[in-house]
Amino acid sequence: MSTFVNTDPTAFKGVWVFCEQREGKLMPTDFELISEGRKLADDLGVELCGLLLGDKVEGLAKELGGYGADRIIVCEHPLLKDYTTDAYTKVICDVVMEKKPEIMLIGATNIGRDLGPRCAATLHTGLTADCTHLDVDVEKYKAFLKTTSTMDVDNMKFDEGTHLKMTRPAFGGHLM
């Protein structure tokens, strides 16, 4: 069972973006996600944080900050130089369990399509794939947080819909 069961939902703060790099270069989806993440973070009044894994990638963090991220968490290790499912999943899930972001965006790249479901399964949380637009009903979301004292699904009551609304692309897209 998830570490987050019986955790106060207000303990989760911030919008995070997994920033993918290959051979020391940021991917175009990183900039799309930072832009979308900035809008969500502004709507919710929270920090936008990028999460960058690799080896000797500190310089890329400065570049991401210039695109609107408030903060970049950099996890560096020689074993993170190239993507491997197990290593990236372990590092990301450990950081997420410690820092507790409320939203995490992962690009729908080959790596993201492998990594996103594995992180969601490890963290016992949901995953919404193939989104091209994200919108949060801020008032309902805040009301939900005020009336819910636990992340235990059995205690959650939802009204007409969800608090995160999305649209699926007709012929592809790059956001997940």
Task: Enumerate the language-model features and the residues they cover.
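N-terminal glycine-rich FAD/FM-binding segment characteristic of electron-transfer flavoproteins
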Residues: 1-176
